Amino acid sequence: MTEKTYTLEEQLALIQRGAQEILSEEDLVKKLKLNRPLRIKAGFDPTAPDLHLGHTVLINKLKHFQDLGHEIYFLIGDYTAKIGDPSGKNSTRPPLTDEQIKANAETYAEQVFKILDKEKTRVVFNSEWFNDMSAADMIQLASHQTVSRMLERDDFSKRYASQTPIAIHEFLYPLVQGYDSIALKADVELGGTDQTFNLLMGRTLQGRYGQEQQVCITVPILEGLDGVNKMSKSLNNYVGIYDAPGTMYQKLLSMPDTLIRRYFEFLSFKPMEEVENLMAEMEDGRNPQEIKRILAEELIERFHDADAAANAHKSAGNVLADGELPVDLPEVTLELEGQDALFITQILNQAALAKNSSSAKDMIKRGAVKVDGEVVDAGFSLTAGQTVVIQAGKKAYAKVTVD
């Protein structure tokens, strides 16, 4: 089967999709005009063993380049993980142990090949070249930058101004990451917007070492399901790529409508023309839950399989008797009004999921009240900031948020 060929304009359109910044687009065009596979690099420190959808924004961009016929280098920073990336941190980040790095790194390849073509991806570890680097070589590398240049970085400058300690090894991180681009002779490096300084460091160092400078492309940090903070396990606003199909389905259908376009742009592989048509349908009155369902099924098929995608709604919390999540799930916001928490009886009454307190207590006693698919007792409560899906009886349901 002959692989599709892309015009320069088609390549640029796909590369620009979801990209925050391209430094510089003029250089990128020059490289694309060479009509040879470009060496595309993205580095990942194995700081956590499991990926969520926020991590896949960058991997999806690698997939775009892969589909265009370019060479993909998925760099696992096992060496740099021993330093600890200070990007965006207001304090020194503790380095990982060799055992932690090995355990975390082992899970990466398996997960990324849910997206990337294994046969067309080179997985490399930066310990391959750094383990053989001498102290003299490292000092030589450090000589290519100044302390004043390092302090131009936002997080370093803030810590310096507030007299928060900055360890010398943290200054090495951008240099070491930059040297990765030299070792791989990268044409393009991808990273999150929090990595701009480090990506540009690689571009600068390539020039100092006599190489053609890489193009730097940043992608946005994806908001989590709360629509405010970045997707993070610690904030419990994430969708894990290993989440069960029903869990993934329910989480994605719970996202705010304001995130639909961004999630499609960054997470879906549907052509943007098709995405724009879906957005237009929603503006014309199509239920947003139906649009979310389309995205949920695409992602579940990618990370599980087509059968799981077709049946995910049946295990998504059993909100209705047949397992189908309603597309018009009512949303209710409740106020604490000076209380530390709201108990389930109060919640059922205030959310109009029960006729009265007696009815609420009776349903709870009969095990007819479920929160996110789990039966709860009278001791269940919600505190500020929590959002859940509640089913009371066979047909009463609501998405409840406590302020």
Swiss-Prot record:
ATP binds at residue 233. Residues 342-402 form the S4 RNA-binding domain. GO terms for biological process: tyrosyl-tRNA aminoacylation. Belongs to the class-I aminoacyl-tRNA synthetase family. TyrS type 2 subfamily. The keyword NADP does not apply. PROSITE patterns: AA_TRNA_LIGASE_I, S4. Its EC number is 6.1.1.1. It is found in: Cytoplasm. It catalyses: tRNA(Tyr) + L-tyrosine + ATP = L-tyrosyl-tRNA(Tyr) + AMP + diphosphate + H(+). Signal peptide: none annotated. CDD domains: S4 (cd00165), TyrRS_core (cd00805). A motif ('HIGH' region) lies at residues 46-55. The gene is tyrS. Catalyzes the attachment of tyrosine to tRNA(Tyr) in a two-step reaction: tyrosine is first activated by ATP to form Tyr-AMP and then transferred to the acceptor end of tRNA(Tyr). GO terms for cellular component: cytosol. InterPro entries: aa-tRNA-synth_I_CS, aa-tRNA-synth_Ic, Rossmann-like_a/b/a_fold, S4_RNA-bd, S4_RNA-bd_sf, Tyr-tRNA-ligase, Tyr-tRNA-ligase_bac-type, Tyr-tRNA-ligase_bac_2. Homodimer. This is Tyrosine--tRNA ligase. Keywords: Aminoacyl-tRNA synthetase, ATP-binding, Cytoplasm, Ligase, Nucleotide-binding, Protein biosynthesis, RNA-binding. It is an enzyme of class 6 (ligase). GO terms for molecular function: ATP binding; RNA binding; tyrosine-tRNA ligase activity. The keyword RNA-binding applies. A motif ('KMSKS' region) lies at residues 230-234. Gene3D superfamilies: HUPs, RNA-binding S4 domain, Tyrosyl-Transfer RNA Synthetase. It holds the Pfam family S4.
